From Swiss-Prot:
Key words, A-Z: Calcium, Disulfide bond, Hemostasis impairing toxin, Hydrolase, Lipid degradation, Lipid metabolism, Metal-binding, Platelet aggregation inhibiting toxin, Secreted, Signal, Toxin
Catalysed reactions listed for this entry: a 1,2-diacyl-sn-glycero-3-phosphocholine + H2O = a 1-acyl-sn-glycero-3-phosphocholine + a fatty acid + H(+)
EC number of this enzyme: 3.1.1.4
Catalytic center residues: H75, D120
Protein name according to UniProt: Acidic phospholipase A2 S15-109
Organism of provenance: Austrelaps superbus
Lineage start: Eukaryota, Metazoa, Chordata, Craniata, Vertebrata
Length: 144
């Protein structure tokens, strides 16, 4: 092997080692957002749920502030259960369809895909039923 080839091979290996430290990005959040739109028939933008109450959005703590926030806590708890089963819910892709009564998971899905799909479909339907209180969006009070 020529020295130039060895240098290229070394550079590729170093690049791959560096990339292994980059945390994976949530892949199924796009699917979950589409499920939310399916369930609420496009009446409320998905981003309205990203910083709502104590549990809608990144993280979560304290007591849910209302019914919608309880939907988010239940969804968080469902993802925790998925993790206990060895699933990676934020990285798990699945098949589903938008029916007249909201999102429906594909019957052919099994294991982690089915579990995570059920978490997301249940949450999306819960979001659609729960009242949206504008005063709970981007709340400033700490959740305890």
């Amino acid at each position: 092997m020529y020295p130039a080839h060895l240098l290229v091979l070394l550079a590729v290996c170093v690049s791959l080692l560096g990339a292994s430290d980059i945390p994976p990005q949530p892949l199924n959040l796009y699917q979950f957002g589409n499920m939310i739109q399916c369930a609420n028939h496009g009446r409320r933008p998905t981003q309205h749920y990203t910083d709502y109450g104590c549990y809608c959005g990144k993280g979560g703590s304290g007591t849910p502030v209302d019914e919608l926030d309880r939907c988010c806590k239940t969804h968080d708890d469902c993802y925790t259960e998925a993790g206990k089963k060895g699933c990676y819910p934020k990285l798990t892709l699945y098949s589903w369809k938008c029916g007249s009564d909201g999102p429906q998971c594909d019957d052919s899905e099994t294991g982690c895909q089915r579990f995570v799909c059920d978490c997301d479909a249940t949450a999306a339907k819960c979001f659609a039923k729960a009242p949206y209180n504008k005063e709970n969006y981007n709340i400033k009070t700490p959740c305890q």
